[in-house]
């Protein structure tokens, strides 16, 4: 670092040099300070004794005592008053290697960057990038040291280029609010990824029209859902039912024996104890309200599945805090209970599981529509009979042959993922949110088609997570579900879940029609980029 500059880097080095003068003492600082204190105390006591003996004349000893006391006072005053005096630390070091009690110059440490005027804030970009690239400055501390999230991301990006030797020019940087994502969406950002957003619709659902935003790179997907929306709207619309609303978290605990674990299971599931446990759970949030507790036993390990409503939030953090409250209470009642993990996979999050398929997680929704026979022929280019037969052979029997778990559908995850990314949901939760069974039946003497999708685990929220980002907030606003519903907490998240199910209904209808009519490959060759890529490669 060039100390000739007038920036913070020069001041840090200068302070370190001044601090070295304190380290030049012949004895360690701790011993020197102790000797000074002892000298001050002894000389003071000696002077008090001499003052009480007024008849004794002053001699060499008395003068030596006075000089010793004055020297001790001057030393200690200079030690405590000097701004560059070293501080002795006893806490853990930043790198986790605690226990060190060595005296070190406080001024030689980088100044905190939470406010203006810190040394790192005034250092130039080149110094900071070099420090990050060399490992002297951890990349994850740039935001806190600089106090400027945008600058931190820009310098991290440059340091990444130097370390890897590869540029990221194609990765956009401008246009992102890096302050908004701090502590909420992403750590150590260097830019953001662009995804095209298409709009399908209008989807006529429960008497209201929705234009559905979908972020995807799969050609033909938005067009297919749009055709399904057109068929549904032309037939009078779709209707949805919310069956259940409860996010779950299942901690894993261990007890000394299976018998003792069974006792805890009985206690947690006893109706007489529910109000007590609910009161403990509900302390964590204004909106989180415990709905039920269901337990599973494996040897002496117990898995307690807590389910609660979470307002307009998806609710994972909310339910986790409530679970911690209950675990603290249960440890008083069962002191031999050992908490292994706040999540024991019986929840079950981001995994296709039978418990979610049967019990549900998040919002459980059924959406249905009756498609007129003439619409099936004119819009979908097929027949009711072919669609019903295809659904049985493909979605039901075919999925059973494959051993599917909640995958009795054509492509529900396509629509769920595209909607999740567009509206700021957790894309990884499309695993359980896409669990869906699609049913098709002939009605009205075979003239019309009844289609439904049953989705037991749609995990969505309209506040928190990625919903704070400008693009995702705009998509939520397009659907009329942005933010929390103050008049009816939870209403926006519930409506978003029904929109997801309605969009899946449209996507299922259109894809099955394309398969039944033999148009799938042709439509993908028309709308998918693969044909263009092949043409480029051939030329």
Curated annotation (Swiss-Prot):
GO cellular component: endoplasmic reticulum membrane; peroxisomal membrane
GO biological process: coenzyme A metabolic process; isoprenoid biosynthetic process; sterol biosynthetic process
Pathway: Metabolic intermediate biosynthesis; (R)-mevalonate biosynthesis; (R)-mevalonate from acetyl-CoA: step 3/3
CDD domains: HMG-CoA_reductase_classI
Region (Catalytic): 125-539
Pfam families, sorted: HMG-CoA_red (PF00368)
Region (Linker) location: 84-124
Glycosylation sites: 282, 528
Enzyme class: oxidoreductase
GO molecular function: hydroxymethylglutaryl-CoA reductase (NADPH) activity
Biased composition annotated in UniProt, kind: Low complexity: 105-114
Presence of the UniProt keyword Signal in the record: no
Catalytically driven reaction(s): (R)-mevalonate + 2 NADP(+) + CoA = (3S)-3-hydroxy-3-methylglutaryl-CoA + 2 NADPH + 2 H(+)
Record key words, sorted: Endoplasmic reticulum, Glycoprotein, Isoprene biosynthesis, Membrane, NADP, Oxidoreductase, Transmembrane, Transmembrane helix
Listed EC numbers: 1.1.1.34
Localisation: Endoplasmic reticulum membrane
Keyword Transmembrane assigned: yes
SUPFAM superfamilies the record matches: NAD-binding domain of HMG-CoA reductase, Substrate-binding domain of HMG-CoA reductase
Annotated stretches, region: Disordered: 87-116
Transmembrane annotation, as ranges: 63-83, 496-516
Entry's family note: Belongs to the HMG-CoA reductase family.
Job description of the protein: Catalyzes the synthesis of mevalonate. The specific precursor of all isoprenoid compounds present in plants.
Record protein name field: 3-hydroxy-3-methylglutaryl-coenzyme A reductase 1
């Amino acid at each position: 670092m060039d100390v000739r500059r007038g920036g913070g880097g020069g001041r840090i080095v200068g302070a370190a040099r001044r601090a070295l003068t304190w380290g030049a003492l012949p004895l360690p600082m701790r011993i020197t300070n102790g000797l000074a204190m002892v000298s001050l105390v002894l000389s003071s006591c000696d002077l008090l004794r001499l003052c009480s003996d007024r008849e004794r004349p002053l001699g060499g000893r008395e003068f030596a005592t006075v000089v010793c006391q004055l020297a001790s006072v001057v030393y200690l005053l200079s030690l405590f008053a000097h701004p560059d005096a070293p501080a002795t630390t006893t806490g853990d070091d930043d790198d986790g290697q605690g226990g060190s009690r060595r005296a070190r110059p406080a001024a030689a440490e980088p100044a905190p960057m939470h406010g203006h005027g810190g040394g790192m804030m005034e250092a130039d970009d080149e110094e900071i990038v070099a420090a990050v690239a060399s490992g002297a400055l951890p990349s994850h501390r740039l935001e806190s040291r600089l106090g400027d999230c945008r600058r931190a991301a820009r310098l991290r990006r440059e340091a990444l280029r130097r370390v890897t030797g590869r540029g990221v020019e194609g990765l956009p940087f401008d246009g992102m609010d890096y302050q908004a994502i701090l502590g909420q969406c992403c750590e150590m950002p260097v830019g953001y990824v662009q995804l095209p957003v298409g709009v399908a619709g209008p989807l006529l659902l429960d008497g209201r029209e929705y234009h559905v935003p979908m972020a995807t790179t799969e050609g033909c997907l938005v067009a297919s859902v749009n055709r399904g929306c057109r068929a549904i709207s032309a037939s009078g619309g779709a209707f949805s039912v919310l069956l259940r609303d409860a996010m779950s978290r299942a901690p894993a605990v261990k007890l000394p024996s299976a018998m003792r674990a069974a006792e805890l299971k009985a206690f947690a599931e006893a109706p007489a104890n529910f109000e007590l446990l609910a009161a403990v759970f509900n302390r964590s949030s204004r909106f989180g309200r415990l709905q039920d507790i269901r337990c599973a036993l494996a040897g002496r390990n117990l898995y307690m599945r807590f389910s609660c409503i979470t307002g307009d939030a998806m609710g994972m953090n909310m339910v986790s805090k409530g679970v911690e409250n209950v675990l603290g209470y249960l440890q008083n009642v069962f002191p031999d209970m050992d908490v292994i993990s706040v999540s024991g996979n019986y929840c079950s999050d981001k995994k296709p599981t039978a418990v979610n398929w049967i019990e549900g997680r998040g919002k459980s929704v059924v959406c249905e529509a009756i498609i007129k026979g003439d619409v099936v022929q004119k819009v979908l280019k097929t027949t009711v009979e072919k669609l019903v037969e295809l659904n049985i052979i493909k979605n039901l029997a075919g999925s059973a042959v494959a051993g599917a778990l909640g995958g009795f559908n054509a492509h529900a995850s396509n629509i769920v993922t595209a909607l999740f990314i567009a509206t700021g949901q957790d894309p990884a939760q499309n695993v359980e949110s896409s669990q869906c069974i699609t049913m098709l039946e002939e009605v009205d003497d075979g003239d019309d088609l009844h289609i439904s999708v049953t989705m037991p685990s749609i995990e969505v929220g309209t506040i928190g997570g990625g919903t704070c980002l400008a693009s995702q907030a705009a998509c939520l606003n397009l659907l009329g579900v942005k933010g929390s519903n103050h008049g009816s907490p939870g209403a926006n998240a519930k409506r978003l879940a029904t929109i997801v199910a309605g969009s899946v209904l449209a996507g299922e209808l259109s894809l099955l029609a394309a398969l039944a009519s033999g148009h799938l490959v042709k439509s993908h060759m028309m709308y998918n980029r693969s044909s263009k890529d092949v043409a480029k490669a051939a030329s």
